[in-house]
């Protein structure tokens, strides 16, 4: 007992936000076992409170000195904390989004919330993981819960199909990533910490060996799959279309934030001497994602499949900041991801509300929604315009700063393609908005004709509508406060010893 207590004193405070998530998970399971199968909708309070508490503790620990703990397997600094905050924020918003959906579909509440908490836990650990084993375990903690969540509606054939594709391709990518890690372990002389692996590659003079080319390739393939970069994106449309919509909302942001943090850390710490090579590869992946994602999104008839291809293009934009390879680039990534969380979750909140009242996901069935539900249509249009980067919404300022940082870093062709494809994205977003406000009777489907409006202006009937309003307001107002947000992100990144000592500034 003394040893356990000493270990907690030594390590527990440094991972207190993660410990709170674990405690919330344990309490959730205990409460469920006590109440059995009784109707306990208030169970959502447990994970929600745990997530909010974790964010609060994270803020209190923000100014603490950077450390590497757990015998070198976990790194804590403000660079990692800012990504952990984004993950926790996304989870806090996703829990209310799932309340009414799960009640309508009569899915098991406890297991769903347990998977959300466990996936969040894996994502937060992934942001600070400092050795290949911890990285792999954290990534699989996130991935396995993602597979289970995507197939949560087990009676739905599309959901089962999506889960199988996700599981098979996810397992393959994880195997490739583990294979790359094994090369790093061998070439570095048996080192395990990321910093020691980099030093080992230099001391053993293995940087010019063929094996050193295999390791970053395997790493980028694994990361490319998790981020849905082209050509590793094939699973994304099917998973988005077949999975429960709250799950899609969760996965569309959390995995991107966590794996982006991993990509920045592992590529800059382990492969700084081959930065030109992996920069070139990432440029090709980013360009392919921006072009293919936006052009295929135009042809989609399913709303969730359209957002799947839209998310592929969005990660292409985010890659511009990562490829920039300096503190300003990473600041732009953090800033845009903060805006992306609100505008993307706001969009999915609108889809959840519409599909729960109509049972359809077809884009054509949204025609005339403004006549029946002006509030929902207005919120949906606002989020779509923000995703497209239309001023004065937050998406515009996020993309503007992202492209400016890329231009300053000399990525002129990449930024030019980003600007061009952003215009393409505005086209298919406006096409949907045109459908929302149409007054032509021949375009209005029976879904809208029989639509029952259960909400009134500025009045929330359920937590999903409340979450939608929060996301819409944030995706609008945050654009007006972009300068303070950029300043806070810059201060957090500059104060991190990770960025000051290891990243290319």
Swiss-Prot record:
Keywords annotated in UniProt: Chloroplast, Membrane, NAD, NADP, Plastid, Plastoquinone, Quinone, Thylakoid, Translocase, Transmembrane, Transmembrane helix, Transport
A Pfam family it matches? Proton_antipo_M
Domain of life per record:
Eukaryota
Could you tell me the membrane topology recorded for this protein? Multi-pass membrane protein
- GO terms assigned for molecular function: NADH dehydrogenase (ubiquinone) activity; quinone binding
- Keyword Transport in annotation: yes
Q: Which GO terms describe its cellular component?
A: chloroplast thylakoid membrane
Quaternary structure and interacting proteins, as annotated = NDH is composed of at least 16 different subunits, 5 of which are encoded in the nucleus.
> What is the role of this chain?
NDH shuttles electrons from NAD(P)H:plastoquinone, via FMN and iron-sulfur (Fe-S) centers, to quinones in the photosynthetic chain and possibly in a chloroplast respiratory chain. The immediate electron acceptor for the enzyme in this species is believed to be plastoquinone. Couples the redox reaction to proton translocation, and thus conserves the redox energy in a proton gradient.
Q: Which NCBIfam families match?
A: NDH_I_N (TIGR01770), PRK02504.1 (NF002701)
Q: Identify its protein family.
A: Belongs to the complex I subunit 2 family.
Record's protein name: NAD(P)H-quinone oxidoreductase subunit 2, chloroplastic
């Amino acid at each position: 007992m003394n040893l356990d207590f000493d270990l907690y004193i030594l390590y527990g405070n440094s991972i207190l936000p993660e410990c709170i998530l674990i405690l919330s998970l344990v309490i959730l399971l205990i409460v469920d076992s006590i109440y059995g199968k009784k109707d306990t909708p208030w169970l959502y309070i447990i994970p929600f409170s745990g997530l909010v508490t974790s964010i609060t503790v994270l803020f209190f620990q923000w100014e603490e000195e950077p450390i590497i703990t757990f015998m070198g397997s976990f790194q804590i600094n403000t660079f990692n904390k800012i990504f952990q905050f984004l993950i926790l924020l996304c989870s806090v918003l996703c829990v209310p989004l799932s309340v009414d959906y799960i009640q309508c579909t009569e899915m098991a509440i406890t297991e769903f919330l347990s998977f959300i908490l466990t996936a969040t836990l894996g994502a937060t650990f992934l942001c600070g993981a400092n050795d290949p084993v911890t990285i792999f375990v954290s990534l699989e903690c996130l991935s396995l819960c993602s597979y289970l969540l995507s197939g949560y509606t087990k009676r739905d054939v599309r959901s089962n199909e999506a889960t199988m594709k996700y599981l098979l391709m996810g397992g393959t990518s994880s195997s490739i990533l583990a294979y790359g890690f094994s090369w790093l372990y061998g070439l570095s002389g048996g080192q395990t910490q990321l910093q020691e692996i980099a030093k080992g590659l230099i001391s053993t003079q293995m940087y010019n060996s063929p094996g050193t080319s295999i390791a970053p390739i395997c790493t980028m393939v694994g990361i490319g799959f998790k981020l849905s970069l082209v050509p590793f994106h094939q699973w994304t449309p099917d998973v988005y279309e077949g999975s429960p919509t709250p799950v899609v909302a969760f996965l569309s942001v959390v995995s991107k934030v966590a794996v982006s943090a991993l990509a920045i850390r592992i590529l800059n710490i382990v492969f700084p001497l081959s930065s030109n090579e992996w920069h070139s590869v990432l440029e090709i992946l980013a360009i392919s994602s921006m072009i293919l994602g936006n052009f295929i999104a135009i042809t989609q008839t399913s709303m969730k499949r359209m957002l799947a291809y839209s998310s592929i293009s969005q990660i292409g934009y985010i890659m511009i900041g990562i490829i920039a390879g300096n503190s300003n680039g990473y600041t732009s990534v953090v800033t845009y991801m903060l805006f992306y969380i609100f505008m993307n979750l706001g969009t999915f909140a609108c889809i959840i509300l519409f599909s729960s009242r109509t049972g359809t996901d077809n884009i054509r069935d949204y025609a005339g929604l403004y006549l029946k539900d002006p509030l929902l249509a207005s919120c949906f249009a606002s989020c779509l315009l923000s995703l497209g980067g239309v001023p004065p919404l937050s998406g515009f300022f996020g993309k503007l700063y992202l492209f400016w940082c890329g231009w300053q870093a000399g990525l002129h062709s990449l930024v030019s393609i980003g600007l061009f494809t952003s215009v393409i994205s505005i086209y298919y977003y406006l096409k949907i908005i045109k459908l929302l406000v149409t007054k032509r009777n021949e375009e209005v489907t029976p879904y809208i004709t029989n639509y029952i409006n259960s909400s009134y202006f500025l009045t929330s009937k359920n937590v999903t509508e409340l979450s939608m309003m929060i996301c819409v307001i944030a995706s609008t107002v945050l654009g007006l406060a972009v300068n303070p947000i950029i300043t806070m992100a810059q201060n957090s990144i500059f104060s991190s010893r990770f960025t000051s000592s290891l990243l290319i500034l």
